[in-house]
Amino acid sequence: MTDPAGSAATAAPAPTDPAEVLAVYRSRREQMVVLPQGNLALVNTQWISHDADPQPVYGIPGTWSPLEPGVSGLRVRASADDGLRVDGVLVDGEAVVRGRDDPRPSSVVASDTVSAFVIASEEGAYALRVWDAQSEAIRDFGGIDAFPYSEEWVVEADFTPIEGGRAMGFEHLKDDGATKDKIVPGEITFTKDGVDYSLAAFREGRALLLVFSDATSGESTYGVGRFLMVAPSPDGTITLDFNRAYLPPCAFSYNFNCPMPPKQNRFAVPIEAGEKNVLAKDGTLLH
């Protein structure tokens, strides 16, 4: 049988030109945001406090309530007619939905298109995130607008580790000015066009997340700012390829609460590289 994807012998070689590599990356980004649990599929994030009464959650059946303090997850009550499945089992009565902070987080499926999972805050609160693979945002999505590739904004910087890291408060979009501490493991420094920069990025998985804004923010790019994943090299250097700057999840759904750029990460100059805005099919801004 012929492999519909083509054999290794006939597969097209991977692109090596930076602009072509970027085009492949951007195509994959547009595919990822429309996945069943991609950014555009998120229709609700509902926090349920420790002392809350059982309550409905928009977009999914059942009534939801907290577990005992210190126990990961939420409790749901539903009838078999609701069609709600937790870890593959139809709920007819009560079920415990383990949070993503548990070694074995629960899966929740309400229909062919609606799913959910429980997230935890750093303070130990829990919320249900509801995803709809046929959300209005997915139906209206027209693409991610972006700048052309810019060699100017591939910057070589120095990374100076901070022993033990430094706790730094980051404001978040929905927190009314309150900050959440993130550990910044080192300083990112470079000089460009005669200006010295010192940036702060916090750990996100195996890499560092740089949250920044610039003179394009709120003009030709998303107003809250943009993200850039970076990774220091063993020799103490770090490459900031702003062509890979991407829109934060909150640019796709109001149900995300994104960190905002600290003062030192707010560039006074325009960075005309990377993603710009989420577009609707008619070319207007989706949000």
Where are these regions (language model features)?
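Hydrophobic, proline/glycine-rich low-complexity stretches
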Residues: 2-5, 9, 13-40, 44-61, ...
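Long, compositionally biased interface segments
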Residues: 26-29, 231-287
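Forkhead-associated
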Residues: 49-99
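Short strand-coil-strand connectors
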Residues: 58-60, 87, 110-112, 191-195, ...
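Broad, structure-driven detector of short, well-ordered beta-strand segments within folded domains
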Residues: 62-67, 72-77, 113-120, 197-201
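Phosphate/adenylate-binding glycine loop and adjacent helical scaffold
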Residues: 89-117, 124
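Surface-exposed beta-loop interaction hotspot
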Residues: 112, 118-182
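Acidic/His-leaning functional-site neighborhoods
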Residues: 186-234, 243
